[in-house]
Amino acid sequence: MAGDAVTVVLPCLNEEESLPAVLAAIPAGYRALVVDNNSTDDTATVAARHGAQVVVEPRPGYGSAVHAGVLAATTPIVAVIDADGSMDAGDLPKLVAELDKGADLVTGRRRPVAGLHWPWVARVGTVVMSWRLRTRHRLPVHDIAPMRVARREALLDLGVVDRRSGYPLELLVRAAAAGWRVVELDVSYGPRTGGKSKVSGSLRGSIIAILDFWKVIS
């Protein structure tokens, strides 16, 4: 699939430090779309300076930012990755290629690099939620879709309504209900390259995310 058919949506809240390297790693021909979700730093300025399209989404929440980015995209394929540098955008082409093989949604399973400190709350939450997705929804996944690609129109038609941390989990649940073919591939996962995690960076953030997840999955 041609690169110009893909928009990479990057939801951002205060990611000025990590954005330059993240944007530089996006595959040639892919379009970068940064959604500034109430940043108090120079996220929007840095993104524009490095060639990304910038969309401002004032409604707080990860799901709000992702949805705004998908709406603003004009390509047939959309990809979503975190903007903190923890994942390698170079993994995206292999995910996109699975769409041509019949997949409806392709997600990344994080494989930590050697020596990475992955907070135990985040690890346990991921294990529990992915187990629930496998046993209750028959999805062949071991992670909660931190990196993902899908066809834009089909994604919008799926009607995901969560605008907080539960967005990716609801996406998977709705994909299962719709009979989508979901494929999960390994992707590299390293330390964030700047800033502070909005989820695992604090106990409060982790607990809020887990509650959002459980609300979707229960």
UniProtKB/Swiss-Prot annotation:
CDD domains cross-referenced by the UniProt entry: DPM_DPG-synthase_like
GO MF annotations in UniProt: glycosyltransferase activity
Protein family (similarity comment): Belongs to the glycosyltransferase 2 family.
Keyword match Transferase: yes
One matching Pfam family: Glycos_transf_2
EC number annotated for this UniProt entry: 2.4.-.-
Keyword annotations from UniProtKB, A to Z: Glycosyltransferase, Transferase
The keyword Nucleotide-binding belongs to this UniProt entry's keyword annotation: no
Protein known as: Uncharacterized glycosyltransferase MT0564
Organism: Mycobacterium tuberculosis (strain CDC 1551 / Oshkosh)
The organism's place on the tree of life at top rank: Bacteria
